[in-house]
């Protein structure tokens, strides 16, 4: 499994690894990632999974390390199933695998998984050398290599936080791409919100560590410090207990949130190269699965116990495992 660059690529890869290790020997599973993926390694449930961490900050040494470390793996294993989950790191590794197939008569199978409505730059290249491309969103005209499996997320039986439901609970999550503009949106809403209701509202705010001090001061200038919880990463989110969520529309976030609740306003990360978050959002707006405007509610707004999203299948991971292990 290869993934890097962002949580949107890495988290589906880790979900796949955790499920695969339940039916296959984890000693035979290798996860290749970069320094961003290294932050998520604690989510791997088996301690026996092999890992290669490649530092991608210096591109020359990055490519050199890929060639040296990955070539050794291909030389000592002539029949490997590879799955690229996105990020620049996947392309050179999958290309090397293909070259081994051509020139050294290896029997490697190459697959890719695309989390977004449109292919990212790496997967646009990877598609041409892949045996199959597993896609997350349904579409009318599927290409010959494409197989719809949906998106999938981490273990749904994880420990989750317990919120004080005497408060109106608000969550802001910006993903690994950052949440600065979302925080500015939230600050603007708080500044214009009725101060009486603010006392009954609790905010759970994701802030990049590099901006924590500055943004924390902006929040505490507006409201009592006891009404805030600040975090950079939070693994125990109980999404269905929030009265409103302000979130990026990255593929991982959008699917997991909508599985639990539709009390969400998605805001795309517009500086992304291909605007994939905008296309993700457009898909769900078309299906009336995102609020049209962001506002802080003045009363409890929890989803109905009968809430069900027919487009989100948390068990789609079983389908991709069937295809890649048969």
Residue ranges and their predicted role:
Residues 56-81, 91, 99:
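An amphipathic, basic-hydrophobic alpha-helix
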Residues 247, 263-274:
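Short hydrophobic beta-strand element within catalytic cores of glycosyltransferases
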